[in-house]
């Protein structure tokens, strides 16, 4: 299966549209820094929390650098969802100077 992928430049233009940005990192990483508006489901929890992911819109999946998100996208595609991997992950987002939220999510 070819995994659809997108870079952080293109992702910025999609944020705020009818799309879901799913962060699959562990809770500690997510609390340390995250893109505003992300939905958080750790990769290991994904199979048990599928009902939390909208099936009627594209799901952009992000992690720290792109490894876990690649596995998550592969899983979501096999579940029949439209899923896209974010190349470079949160690290690329931060390196490009874009803003993040920090601290425990409210």
What is each stretch, according to the model?
Residues 1-20, 26-58, 67-106:
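Rhodanese-like catalytic fold shared by cysteine-dependent sulfurtransferases
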Residues 61-62:
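Short, surface-exposed ligand- or partner-binding patches at beta-edge/loop junctions that are enriched
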């Amino acid at each position: 299966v070819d995994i659809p992928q997108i870079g952080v430049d293109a992702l910025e233009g999609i944020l705020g549209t009818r799309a879901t940005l799913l962060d699959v990192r562990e809770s500690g990483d997510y609390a340390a820094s995250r893109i505003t508006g992300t939905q958080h489901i750790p990769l290991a929890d994904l199979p048990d929390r599928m009902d939390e992911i909208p099936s009627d819109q594209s799901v952009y999946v992000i992690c720290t650098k792109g490894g876990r998100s690649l596995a998550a996208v592969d899983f979501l595609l096999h579940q029949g969802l439209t899923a896209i991997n974010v190349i470079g992950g949160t690290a690329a987002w931060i390196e490009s100077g874009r803003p993040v939220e920090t601290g425990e999510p409210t």
